[in-house]
Amino acid sequence: KIPKKLINGGKIMKKITLFFLGCIFALLASSNSFAESTMSQEGQYIFNSLGFYIGGVLVAFMAAGFCMLESGLVTTKSVSTIGAKNIGKFAICSIIFFLFGYNIAYGVPEGGYIGSFSIWSDGSEVGTGYSDSSDWFFQTMFVCATVSIVSGAVAERIKIWPFFTFAVVMSGLIYPISMGWQWGGGWLSAAGFSDFAGSTIVHACGGAAALAGIIVLGAREGRFTSSGGKRVMVPFAASSIPLVTLGTFLLWFGWFGFNGFSQLAMGTFDDV
């Protein structure tokens, strides 16, 4: 004989299940009406700008992730230099992209190749859909991520000041030009090319610069030695695997902002 408590419990679970199924069907039935509804211009401006800020904060965590990953993979003697290099890189990229990189990217004539070398100003209005300042913040984090790709490739191959010089050129010229070609409405955009979250503008651009760097700089000092007339690779012990693990999780966390907020809008039901 089935205990009475089990019978009552089964009835309760059945009611709960039916309740949640009803809620799901109600949401599905009303989703079309929600999708068609529109928010006011002021509401869209607020939520889109907030989206840029939240996404930018998440991507900023990637800077810490790159730093931890890079610090953990290099030899112990280079850890302090890597930390200083990553902090300096973040500051340099932010300043240079503010001074003229943003205008080079977004000041491109339609179908053109390069924007203007001038300091930008936030002239956004409610009708534009978002604040230019929030977009600058979000895009600046992308610049820092791009330069971080190169930073990891040339770790222990380059001194800190030459790298800072490269960071100025990368964040103020190379990256903004490639960004303007597509996201700024340049010739690639006019040709129909699309890059949703930086697979070309960020990763291919950063990867090409990193490849050029390691070809020019060569291997890390002491990485190879001669033995019996042959070139033998010397294994380098990583300074800290826990740092590598921490960096991996920080990058994983930051990527939700990097890719997710590349929608560039959260002012409508469809965007969200």
Task: Kindly give the residue locations of the regions a language model identified.
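Short, Lys/Arg-enriched N-terminal segments with co-localized hydrophobic residues
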Residues: 1-12
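Hydrophobic alpha-helical transmembrane bundles of multi-pass membrane proteins
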Residues: 14-272
